[in-house]
């Protein structure tokens, strides 16, 4: 008989609730919707002495795993203890997020749990992990996910093709979702001298692979009175942030408001002339999807993970090409009618295609397919997903 409600463990994020990064947003959005449907969800948060430790939030249970608060060790220690805790916990499904934490996904698997891994991006390619040990550990996590996960979820066609070509491993393509946001008038942003449509916005983590240096360099040579806002927090990338400030020191049009959230974040999205995401590497960029939901005209690098989100409802430039980025920015600055068109169509397009409610149902359907003696709820699954699950089950029975 099918189990109506499941006990689910989430592992691999920093902490929930938070906007520390895209993974934290994803875990929070999924967990609160799963709880609302009657499932039990436990998020295994990192321990941080400087952060409060509530036992729960919005019906989500919160556990805190030992974390070595030292650069390079926080993620790996929290991932190990998170997977260990989930392995010995009373859970039907353990959902591990990201390749690094997947290094330990064999622990809950060893204890008889069913394990789902979501690859949010090929993290070993990111600039911050480009030392031999870190990159190799993340790559090994990728290999552990391929070997031990009952189901492997990816967010883009490019990642799906990568796992097929590299490992011969079938994956499930289930992109992330985005809420439907209501734009708001400028109030708090006026403290930075910002008004509606008088600035270009980047909003995200301050790390080299996001390409903020391309944007600053392209912008510096544009004859415009529109400001450039580089909004985002700094964790392990203070040196890179200092480099960005040095690049912009002679241009008082460039503003660094730091980490933003709440009303200030909403106002920045709502009133930007255009939003720019110049990334070299992405998983599935939630900030890009949020910008479109708020009604931004978006300009992004042409990597698959961004271009597949935008499609024809935004503008792309060649990755890493500062001249092309400058030309595309100049064109948008000179054509407000084009910008208005993209703004008008972005919210309906992105929210229809990437509803969090639909995404949650698809994840739950995969969970049910992974729980022993249960069949997926096929009415919740697209035909392609049903076919993939059925094929995999037939292969297992045939062994």
Task: Specify the residue positions occupied by each region the protein language model found.
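Glycosyltransferase donor-sugar binding loop
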Residues: 48-49, 178, 203, 227-242, ...
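Membrane-proximal helix-turn-helix segments that form the acceptor-binding/catalytic region
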Residues: 84-87, 110, 133-151
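Conserved acidic donor-binding segment of nucleotide-sugar-dependent glycosyltransferases
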Residues: 315-323, 331-337
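Aromatic "clamp/platform" in nucleotide-sugar-dependent glycosyltransferases that forms part
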Residues: 280
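Short alpha-helical donor nucleotide-sugar binding micro-motif in glycosyltransferases
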Residues: 259-260, 267-272
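Short hydrophobic beta-strand element within catalytic cores of glycosyltransferases
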Residues: 297-300
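A conserved mid-protein helix/loop that constitutes part of the nucleotide-sugar donor-binding site
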Residues: 25, 198, 202, 207-221
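Nucleotide-activated donor-binding/catalytic signature segment of Leloir-type glycosyltransferases, i.e.
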Residues: 241-263
């Amino acid at each position: 008989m099918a189990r109506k409600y499941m006990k689910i463990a989430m592992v691999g994020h920093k902490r929930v609730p938070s906007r520390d990064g895209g993974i934290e947003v994803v875990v929070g959005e999924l967990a609160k919707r799963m709880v609302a449907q009657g499932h039990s969800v436990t998020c295994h948060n990192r321990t941080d002495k400087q952060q409060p430790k509530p036992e729960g939030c919005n019906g989500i249970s919160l556990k805190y795993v030992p974390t070595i608060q030292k650069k390079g060790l926080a993620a790996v220690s929290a991932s190990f203890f998170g997977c260990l805790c989930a392995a010995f916990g009373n859970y039907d499904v353990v959902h591990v997020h990201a390749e690094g934490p997947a290094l330990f996904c064999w622990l809950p698997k060893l204890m008889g749990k069913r394990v789902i891994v979501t690859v949010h991006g090929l993290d070993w390619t990111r600039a911050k992990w480009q030392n031999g040990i870190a990159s190799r550990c993340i790559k090994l996590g990728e290999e552990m996910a391929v070997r031990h996960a009952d189901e492997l979820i990816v967010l883009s066609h490019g990642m799906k093709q990568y796992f097929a070509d590299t490992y011969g491993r079938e994956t499930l393509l289930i992109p992330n979702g985005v809420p439907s946001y209501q734009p708001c008038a400028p109030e708090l942003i006026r403290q930075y001298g910002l008004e509606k449509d008088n600035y270009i916005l980047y909003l995200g983590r301050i790390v080299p692979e996001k390409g903020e240096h391309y944007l600053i360099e392209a912008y510096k040579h544009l004859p415009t009175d529109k400001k450039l806002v580089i909004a985002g927090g700094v964790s392990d990338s203070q040196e890179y942030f200092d480099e960005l400030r040095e690049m912009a020191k002679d241009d008082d049009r460039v503003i660094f408001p730091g980490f933003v959230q709440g009303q200030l974040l909403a106002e920045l999205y709502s009133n930007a002339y255009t939003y720019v995401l110049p990334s070299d590497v992405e998983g599935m960029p939630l900030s890009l999807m949020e910008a479109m939901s708020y009604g931004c005209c978006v300009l992004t690098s042409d990597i698959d993970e961004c271009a597949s989100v935008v499609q024809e409802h935004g503008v792309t430039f060649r990755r890493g090409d500062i001249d092309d980025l400058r030309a595309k920015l100049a064109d948008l600055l000179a054509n407000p009618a084009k910008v208005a068109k993209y703004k008008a169509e972005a919210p309906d397009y992105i929210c229809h295609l990437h509803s969090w409610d639909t995404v949650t149902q698809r994840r739950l359907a995969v969970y049910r397919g992974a729980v022993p003696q249960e069949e997926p709820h096929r009415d919740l699954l697209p035909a392609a997903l049903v076919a993939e699950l059925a094929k995999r089950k037939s292969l297992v029975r045939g062994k």
